UniProtKB/Swiss-Prot annotation:
One of its GO terms (cellular component) is chloroplast. The lineage of its organism: Eukaryota, Viridiplantae, Streptophyta, Embryophyta, Tracheophyta. PANTHER family: PROTEIN TAB2 HOMOLOG, CHLOROPLASTIC (PTHR34556:SF2), PTHR34556. Its main location: plastid. It is found in: Plastid, Chloroplast. This is Protein TAB2 homolog, chloroplastic. Residues 66-90 are annotated as: Disordered. Nuclear genome-encoded factor involved in the biogenesis of photosystem I (PSI). Required for the accumulation of PSI during plant development. Does not seem to be required for the translation of mRNAs of the PSI subunits. The keyword Cell wall biogenesis/degradation does not apply. Keywords: Chloroplast, Plastid, Transit peptide. InterPro entries: Tab2-like, Tab2-like_C, Tab2-like_N. One of its GO terms (molecular function) is RNA binding. The keyword Cell inner membrane does not apply.
């Protein structure tokens, strides 16, 4: 059994794992042993207490109280006010909102969904809706449509009206998470000069849809309880990893929540490859010392590997303990066998502990790419989040 230490992202955190590295059937990483580190004791990724995280996805109804809370000390009163306003939200109203303090020119990426809702119109037909926002929810737009006008022309015109109505430029990129809508969305975006990006990294949008289900759709007079989503998310069987995405070695690792925050904040400053999440917007209530589970990958081609990974729209990682594989999910419906390990009672226990730790952290985890697992820096860092499929 080999024992190794991975020091991630310049924080000097030594994390030891004990795994027999092996080639899975769709080989990803070599079976070379990691160098031992005698100065550290072994640390198994342990499950923490369940996270108290609540996703506070900013809504239009809470914007005024959020702004006021910044100028007053009575936060609890403002939150109560926000909650009561949300309860009185008109389920028939459409949203057209831009945060007055937002840099309109700086909103270069949108997240959008164009799909049916569990609502019937006067004809007894499904109502469709366009929902658009940015990652910070500074921009929010919704519009309902009859099912007779669902095409790329309708979507193109609606997206153009978002820009004109709010006085913002069209974005450079628009993310969407439903693979079934790729043709319509791509065509509409292309005609506007916007790059359509299939991606499940639409975290703000997904959380806003959850909120709208509770505050809008379920209160609509045409709401159909128990209706399943028309377009469900794909979850295909994982395939072999492309040759250019192979690494040399990998390790289960952990970082304190405070260090994860630092790494995300430093991404833009260092122009590193990777992607973060707005942890404040998501409302993570974790202790700064809570250990966040992750995967560290060593590669002699770390920079090219990180660059290639940067184009994948990585959204999550999970362990398939039955097949002793690590699965990488990217885009909207892509799943790769990213790594494998020799299956045993010990490795299965460690993999299960890693998954349990992830669940205890509200689904938060990360992927780090390094030139050396014993180095004190990383070339690429992706903060990832497990999210359930949207209710619509």
């Amino acid at each position: 059994m080999t024992t190794a230490t991975a020091i991630v992202a310049g924080h000097g955190l030594a994390l030891r794992r004990s795994l027999h590295l092996s080639k899975p059937s769709c080989a990803t990483f070599s079976a070379r042993a990691l160098p031992p580190a005698a100065h550290c004791c072994r640390t198994v990724v342990a499950a923490a207490a369940p996270s108290s995280r609540t996703c506070r996805c900013r809504s239009v109804s809470s914007e005024s109280s959020t702004a006021a809370a910044a100028d007053t000390a009575d936060d609890e009163e403002e939150v109560t006010k926000s909650d009561s306003e949300e309860e009185e939200m008109d389920p028939l109203a459409e949203v057209c909102y831009l945060d007055p303090e937002a840099d309109a020119e700086g909103i270069r990426e949108w997240e959008l969904d164009f799909c049916s809702r569990p609502i019937l119109d006067a004809r007894g037909k499904k109502v469709w809706e366009l929902v658009v926002c940015d990652a910070t929810l500074s921009l929010q737009f919704t519009r309902f449509f009859p099912n007779t006008s669902i095409n790329s022309v309708t979507l193109r015109d609606a997206l153009a009206s978002v820009a004109t109505s709010l006085g913002v430029p069209l974005p450079d990129r628009a993310r969407f998470f439903r693979s079934q809508m790729q043709t319509i969305i791509s065509r509409a975006c292309n005609e506007l000069g916007v790059k359509a990006v299939p991606s499940r990294r639409c975290v703000s949008l997904l959380l806003w849809l959850e909120e709208r289900y509770e505050t809008v759709y379920s209160r609509h007079p045409g709401f159909q309880s128990g209706t399943k989503p028309l377009l469900t998310l794909d979850n295909p069987f994982p395939t072999s990893l492309p040759e250019n995405l192979f690494g040399d070695k990998w390790a289960f690792v952990q970082l304190p929540f405070s260090a994860v925050r630092e790494e995300v904040e430093s991404l833009e400053r260092r122009y590193a490859f990777g992607a973060g999440l707005d942890l404040d917007l998501l409302g993570f209530e974790l202790d700064e010392n809570t250990l966040i589970p992750g995967v560290a990958v060593e590669s002699s081609r770390a920079k090219p590997l990180a660059a290639w990974m940067n184009g994948l729209e990585i959204c999550s990682m999970e362990v398939d303990t039955g097949r002793a594989n690590l699965i990488l999910s990217a885009g909207v419906s892509t799943r790769y066998v990213y790594a494998g390990y020799q299956k045993s009672a010990a490795t299965t226990q460690e993999a299960e502990a890693w998954e349990a730790a992830k669940k205890a952290c509200g689904g938060l985890h990360f992927l780090a790419i390094q030139e050396n697992l014993n180095s004190d820096g990383c070339v690429g860092f992706w903060l990832l989040l497990d999210l359930p499929p949207p209710p619509v």
